[in-house]
């Protein structure tokens, strides 16, 4: 693999790191101020809402909207006004001085006068034996991605907040039963969400218990529970477990550059979005330890863009000096949205579509290694990884074939290879599965994972 850094000479006015409501709103407002923001969405673009089933409390959507749909709309709106979006992950930053720089996982360096941090949060796991070992084999943090694999089965949800209730309610569409395990007697969830869960006959409750281990060898067979009052341990027999115990701020990228609190949240000055580093602003759940709502994240993204615009006008002599008025509609040369990502990849003709019927000929009998992407049209993270796989398929076509299998229309092979989480990518060599990768990853990370099996990837 070629990891030599490459610098781009253009100095941008604003770079936004992260997406979700905060990142996309910051991009929208910066674009309307004619700052032409460069946005690094990352491979988890769309943020936590990409795994949310239903958003009922975002103003303007009286009938609700799914998380991926809301993010799709926000992303397209930012594009429409001229934001430049890239799905690369940022690996390191240099934020001191008048010109800031970011380095992507692919070794590319980009520069800007101001930076907006909107990396959001990541899923908090239990950190117990068996959890990471069985991730993607019955352990999940995304009900919308993986719930359909547990039709007619007994599963568990761990947590006590709104997210746990939402996951449990969604999973009742597929599971025979859902047991909600919480370490306390009282729940943090809102009354309306808790009431819905209690009124669902498929949902059972176990309170005052912690999960001490996930049982299973190749797949989940149960949970080891400990009573927080008596200390007694029991086994709950389930085939799947969904973790919904909250999130942690993704601040490790800047933890040695800007001030953060003991829990990792980026600190801002007063009622602004300014961080301890001049010209660096922060927004969304990366900052907010109290409200953590889509609407508050969007609001702080707006504030960050306005703060950055004013700072540039005062300090950098940028385009922000030329206009602070809202602009009218503009044409964007890039209007791609997530709903077309899978179609675009397919039409490019580099990846191949395989089915249960063609699996033997296309995959198991291939002379070349074949990376099979198990995906579905409704899977948000699958849309994230689709263009990355298309790019790898094009660049590595001499060493590797990339194939896609829709688990909805071709469930047999998914069952055969115990795929219970998507996206799951399995590398086949000589007709045998030799590598399994669960979850959306960036190009550089995927190539690193594959290079120990397939040589000469670059």
Curated annotation (Swiss-Prot):
Gene3D superfamilies: FAD/NAD(P)-binding domain, Glutaredoxin. It catalyses: [thioredoxin]-dithiol + NADP(+) = [thioredoxin]-disulfide + NADPH + H(+). The keyword NADP applies. CDD domains: TRX_family (cd02947). It is an enzyme of class 1 (oxidoreductase). SUPFAM superfamilies: FAD/NAD(P)-binding domain, Thioredoxin-like. Residues 341-455 form the Thioredoxin domain. Keywords: Cytoplasm, Disulfide bond, Electron transport, FAD, Flavoprotein, NADP, Oxidoreductase, Redox-active center, Transport. Its EC number is 1.8.1.9. Disulfide bonds join 142-145, 379-382. NADP(+) binds at residues 163, 182, 188, 245, 265, 292. FAD binds at residues 19-22, 41-48, 57, 90, 285, 292-295. In the pathogen M.leprae, thioredoxin reductase (TR) and thioredoxin (Trx) are encoded by a single gene. N-terminal part of the protein corresponds to TR and the C-terminal part to Trx. This is Bifunctional thioredoxin reductase/thioredoxin. It comes from Mycobacterium leprae (strain TN). The lineage of its organism: Bacteria, Bacillati, Actinomycetota, Actinomycetes, Mycobacteriales.
């Amino acid at each position: 693999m070629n990891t030599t850094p490459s610098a781009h000479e253009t100095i941008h006015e604003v770079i936004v790191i992260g997406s979700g409501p905060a990142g996309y709103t910051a991009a929208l407002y910066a674009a309307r101020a004619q700052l032409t923001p460069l946005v690094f969405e990352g491979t988890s673009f769309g943020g936590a809402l990409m795994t949310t089933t239903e958003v009922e409390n975002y103003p303007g959507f009286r009938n609700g909207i799914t998380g991926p749909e809301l993010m799709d709309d926000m992303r397209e709106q930012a594009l429409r006004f001229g934001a430049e979006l890239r799905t690369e992950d940022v690996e390191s930053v240099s934020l001191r001085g008048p010109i800031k720089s970011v380095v992507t996982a692919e070794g590319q360096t980009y520069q800007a006068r101001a930076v907006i941090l909107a990396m959001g949060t990541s899923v908090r796991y239990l950190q117990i034996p068996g959890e990471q070992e069985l991730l993607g084999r019955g352990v999940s943090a995304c009900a919308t991605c993986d719930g359909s694999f547990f039709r007619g089965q007994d599963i568990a949800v761990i947590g006590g907040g709104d997210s746990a209730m939402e996951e449990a309610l969604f999973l009742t569409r597929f599971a025979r039963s859902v047991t909600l395990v919480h370490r306390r007697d009282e729940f943090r969830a809102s009354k309306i969400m808790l009431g819905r869960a209690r009124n669902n006959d498929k949902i059972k409750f176990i309170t005052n218990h912690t999960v001490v281990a996930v049982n299973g060898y190749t797949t989940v067979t149960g949970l080891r529970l400990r009573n927080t009052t008596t200390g007694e341990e029991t086994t709950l027999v389930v085939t799947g477990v969904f973790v919904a115990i909250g999130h942690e701020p993704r601040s490790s990228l800047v933890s040695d550059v800007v001030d953060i609190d003991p829990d990792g949240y980026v600190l801002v000055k007063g009622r602004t979005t300014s961080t301890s580093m001049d010209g660096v602003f922060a927004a969304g759940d990366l900052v907010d330890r109290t409200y953590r709502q889509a609407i508050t994240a969007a609001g702080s993204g707006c504030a960050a863009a306005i703060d950055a615009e004013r700072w540039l006008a005062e300090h950098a002599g940028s385009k922000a000096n030329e206009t602070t008025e809202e602009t009218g509609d503009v044409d964007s040369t890039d209007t791609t949205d997530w709903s077309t990502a899978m179609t675009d990849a397919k039409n490019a003709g580099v990846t191949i579509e395989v089915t249960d019927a063609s699996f033997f000929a296309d995959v198991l009998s291939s002379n070349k290694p074949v990376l099979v992407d198990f995906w579905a049209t409704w899977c948000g993270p699958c849309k994230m990884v689709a263009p990355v796989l298309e790019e790898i398929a094009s660049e590595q076509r001499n060493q590797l074939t990339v194939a896609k299998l829709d688990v909805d229309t071709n469930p047999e092979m998914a069952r055969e290879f115990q795929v219970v989480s998507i996206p799951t990518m399995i590398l086949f060599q000589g007709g045998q599965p030799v590598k399994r990768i669960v979850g959306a990853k960036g190009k550089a990370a995927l190539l690193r994972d594959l290079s120990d099996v397939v040589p000469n990837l670059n």
